[in-house]
Amino acid sequence: MRDARKDAIEMAARRERLLEAGFRLMSARTIEAVTLQQIADEAKIGIATLYRYFKAKPDLVIEIGTNIWKRYYVEVEKEYARLNGPAMNAAEELEFFLDSIIELYRSRRDVLRFNRNFDTYVQHERCTAAQMRPYNDAVAVFAKKFHTVVRKARADGTIDIRVSEPKLFVNLLYTMLSVAGKYAEGLVYPPDGERDMTDELEAIKRMILGSLT
């Protein structure tokens, strides 16, 4: 007699192996360059089994992207709590979010490389709104967190807000993510032969904060 609980655990473990293998390969190369067969081989799982979990490559890619941002959000929330985020003023909280992106560059450049390639891939594949919903929901929580910055700014005046909240969110955090992603991919020629662009990201952060405070 089959053990349903054991089967469920084994299925979840195989799924996770496929997701981890896909992320490893796609962040090291590009999403387009990696085939499902290569992912199955990397995970040491048969291709037929892979197709039982993911009907097509975009399904796997979107789940990888969704999981990345869900896990990152948990990490950000832990650090926010550790630093007593609710007690921060708006400028301090904005700096916290910018620092969170810089920390991604320091410690998880693979995430930034995958993320840079992700948007291009899903647009090329013409993924539907229904397909993208889990991913968009995972990203939307950051916009909700950013709302706290705006609410505090209106109360304490430590940030000068002259544009709408959505524009501010996109202009600041997405721009920072985009630049960090380019640095992670090595697409920006490093000054003086330096390969670590952390100082450049810190300079961008200071310019952003200086323009708003």
Question: What residue ranges belong to the model's regions?
Answer:
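N-terminal intrinsically disordered/low-complexity leader segments
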Residues: 1-13, 80
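C-terminal peripheral helix-coil segments that are non-catalytic and often amphipathic
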Residues: 1-2, 100-103, 140, 144-156, ...
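Generic hydrophobic, amphipathic alpha-helix propensity
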Residues: 11-22, 39, 64-68, 72, ...
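Helix-turn-helix
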Residues: 17, 25-63
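Short amphipathic alpha-helical elements of helix-turn-helix/winged-helix folds
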Residues: 21-25, 104
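Amphipathic alpha-helical segments used for helix-helix packing
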Residues: 105-129, 181-187
